Each structure stands twice: as C-alpha cells, then as structure tokens.
Amino acid sequence: MVAFSDKQEALVNGAYEAFKANIPKYSVVFYTTILEKAPAAKNLFSFLANGVDATNPKLTGHAEKLFGLVRDSAAQLRASGGVVADAALGAVHSQKAVNDAQFVVVKEALVKTLKEAVGDKWSDELGTAVELAYDELAAAIKKAY
C-alpha cells in the first residue's frame, strides 16, 4: 500500500490537464525525448517508423493514453493505495519485451514533458507525485505480464 494524498492526486491531474492543452506539441516533446535517450525504442512503436510527427493520430493518441494512465494511477493510489493494470496492457508490454531500463526512459520523458507543460507551476512535490504514480503504474504493468 502506498500513501497518496488528495493534494498529490490534484497535482498529477493538473499536470495532465496542462499536457492536454497542447497534445500534439507535448507528444512531440515526449517521443523526441524517448528517442534521444533510447533510439532503439523506435522499434517498439510502429507509429514512429517515419519519425516523430505531431500530425500522426497514433502518436498523439498513444501519448494521451499513457499520460491518462498515469493520471488514473494517481486516482487509484489515492483511493486504494495500489494500482491495478489491465491484463491486456501487461500482455502488450510482455510481447514487446519492454524491460526496466525502457520503463525508466519513459518515466524520464514523462517528467520532462510535464515539466515543460506546467512551466513555472513545476515543483519538487509535483515531480514526486508524478514519479510515484508512474512507478506504481509500471509495477502494475509488469505484474500483469
């Protein structure tokens, strides 16, 4: 069980709303960061075959889904102290052989993107809340393998 406060959930929700304010822009930031840190990740995402394109609905849709899952993770943590991931999500990550290092790269890209999205509203408290929500989501996905 993880203690997650109402304030932490609100911080994560606010960051998600900032991301949603310009999904194409922040999707590009997110995937560009991933590819800078781990160029081989291009092979994990079929929609990156032609590079990072803000007009690609699969790119923006996947980013929105991931950021939404982190927001949902925060809600689950506040409500129950744990996160449960859909079995299909675990199966996809297992099939793609996503490893711990790749989860770390995604977390770093997520944090960088949200930091840019919220601008001067970024704080250590927000960063901690986002990282905790993501870490618990990643653990739940791995458990669902």
From Swiss-Prot:
It is found in: Cytoplasm, Cytosol; Nucleus. Nitrated in effective nodules and particularly in hypoxic conditions; this mechanism may play a protective role in the symbiosis by buffering toxic peroxynitrite NO(2)(-). Nitration level decrease during nodule senescence. Residues 3-145 form the Globin domain. Keywords: Cytoplasm, Heme, Iron, Metal-binding, Nitration, Nitrogen fixation, Nodulation, Nucleus, Oxygen transport, Phosphoprotein, Transport. One of its GO terms (molecular function) is oxygen carrier activity. Belongs to the plant globin family. PANTHER family: LEGHEMOGLOBIN-RELATED (PTHR22924), NON-SYMBIOTIC HEMOGLOBIN 2 (PTHR22924:SF92). Monomer. This is Leghemoglobin-1. It comes from Vigna unguiculata (Cowpea).
